[in-house]
Amino acid sequence: MNDYNHYFHFPREEWRKLEVSKDQILTAEELEEIRGLNDRISLQDISEIYLPLIKLIAIQYHEAIFIHGEKMEYLKKKESRAPFIIALAGSVAVGKSTTARVFKLMLDRWFSKTRQVELVTTDGFLYPNKVLEERGIMDKKGFPESYDRDRFAKFLTDLKANKEDVEVPLYSHFTYDVLDETRMMHNPDIVIIEGINVLQADQHESLYPSDFFDFSVYMDANEADIKNWYLERFFMLRETAFQDESSYFHPYTKISKKEAETFALGVWDTINGVNLKENIEKTKYRADLVLHKGTDHLISDIYLRK
């Protein structure tokens, strides 16, 4: 399906002409600090794509605050508004994590740090490896059944119920497992939730994650490009982070490059690629906005729900 009928289409050249102050732009040093491995996001992308997008999100945020205030005044209630939740979805290796960090830094800048902006990844809501192994679904890590959906639903419910302190589970890409410790969020104003599964719906669940989101973004690219980026990132990690003997993937530094390539291709063809086609890509049209990347990593097209 390729149904963008209910979206406005902005080619890059049109989107970049949207008026916005350049005062909020990031520096090269700030961008370098948050850029992910093998993610080629540039200051040009920040200026031409993300700055107009952040302004759009700010407009939506202020509109939500205004509507809530009007409603509370009419109902004669004094309850503050629940956090404004931004969802960011897309495949493994498409650049979600860097984009989420860009969102956080630019929203902090936009609101001059007068709003508390938090970033949460859904990796923390995976079942621990021990549970996945017990259930025989370690090779389905990242698929819908590998997530603790009850825990994720409680997290979202706590946020929207305006609970003062909300527990956030943590995940380590180094050990490739959920950590025992958690962190607490205290009264956030804006929460960015990033993960491959955030827009997925389970017909057997009474609550859909998307019910809780105020704005949602899907990072899109052609599968062949994403596969190439995944392989490039794998080999970069093989030369860096995987070299640490404590890394879950350290054994793959001890085999030949050809064997490592066979392993990485196998992971894509049997896990990540399958998950993209069966579960992730179909959520694209649930997003309020789709960012499409070209082969060069630059965002070429923006689709905004009408």
Curated annotation (Swiss-Prot):
It is found in: Cytoplasm. It is an enzyme of class 2 (transferase). One of its GO terms (cellular component) is cytoplasm. The keyword DNA damage does not apply. Its EC number is 2.7.1.33. It catalyses: (R)-pantothenate + ATP = (R)-4'-phosphopantothenate + ADP + H(+). The keyword Cytoplasm applies. GO terms for biological process: coenzyme A biosynthetic process. Keywords: ATP-binding, Coenzyme A biosynthesis, Cytoplasm, Kinase, Nucleotide-binding, Transferase. Pathway: Cofactor biosynthesis; coenzyme A biosynthesis; CoA from (R)-pantothenate: step 1/5. It comes from the Bacteria. It holds the Pfam family PRK. ATP binds at residues 90-97. GO terms for molecular function: ATP binding; pantothenate kinase activity. Belongs to the prokaryotic pantothenate kinase family. NCBIfam families: panK_bact (TIGR00554). This is Pantothenate kinase. It comes from Listeria innocua serovar 6a (strain ATCC BAA-680 / CLIP 11262).
